[in-house]
Curated annotation (Swiss-Prot):
Enzyme class of the recorded protein, top EC level: hydrolase
Cofactor binding summary note: Binds 2 Zn(2+) ions per subunit.
Native organism: Bdellovibrio bacteriovorus (strain ATCC 15356 / DSM 50701 / NCIMB 9529 / HD100)
Cofactors, names only: Zn(2+)
Recorded catalytic activity of this chain's protein: an S-(2-hydroxyacyl)glutathione + H2O = a 2-hydroxy carboxylate + glutathione + H(+)
EC number: 3.1.2.6
An individual GO BP term: methylglyoxal catabolic process to D-lactate via S-lactoyl-glutathione
Pfam families: HAGH_C, Lactamase_B
Xref: PANTHER family: HYDROXYACYLGLUTATHIONE HYDROLASE, HYDROXYACYLGLUTATHIONE HYDROLASE GLOB
Coiled-coil blocks: none
Name of the protein in question: Hydroxyacylglutathione hydrolase
Family: Belongs to the metallo-beta-lactamase superfamily. Glyoxalase II family.
Subunit relationships: Monomer.
Pathway: Secondary metabolite metabolism; methylglyoxal degradation; (R)-lactate from methylglyoxal: step 2/2
Amino acid sequence: MAKKEHVELVPIFDDNYVFILTDDATQKAVAVDPGDAGPVIDFLRANKLDLAAILLTHHHSDHIGGVGELKAAFDCPVYAPQKNQKQIPVADQWLKEGDSVTCGPWDFTVMELPGHTLGHIAYWNQKHKWLFSGDVIFGLGCGRLFEGTFEQGYESLQRIKKLPPQTLIYCTHEYTKSNLEFCRILTNQDNTPITGDSEALELYANELSNRRELNLPSVPLKLSIEESVNPFLLARDVEQFRYLRELRNRQ
């Protein structure tokens, strides 16, 4: 029997995911970062779901592009970062660090995780140990720092590392295969200051290959595994993080 509360992934564009939290008991749903409305509406209607809320992590168009159409179709509230009021005028409620949000059966705590953007937030669900992290962290990688500093990017990852090891991270891009190639470049460099668990990385690579061959997502990520293989989580200080991020930017 299907779980009462679960997360479904709706692929959009080339490598984005929209996350649809679904409550089987009430047929209510919550959408996280719907960059495109059409596939989300199709999924909701096919599964006879009513959209109860939209959660946004940051203002980039591939995360908010479908909000207006979805809000008009389902008349649901939109939650967004307080620091992005100008960029996301369609939102109804503005969120900051430590705020609590209840949507249907789900309770979330808001975490401000700047770096990728200055106003970036994530949504933490304690009950299921779910983190909806936007573009802060990816499988074996992290988001580019378009607005924030290296210090902010590093500290945001340190905050994620403090979550329970069983945390499931729902990041919104399928970048894991590309990031694996970067990890292997690091492994083959004699002078790299960051090395992870090579055996764990190969197990990770095998699992990733198996999933992608079946057209299955690499998301959600398991925090306990990312901590042993993700070079950006293994960085011991801001300077190591800067080294990695600048190297990755050149790839």
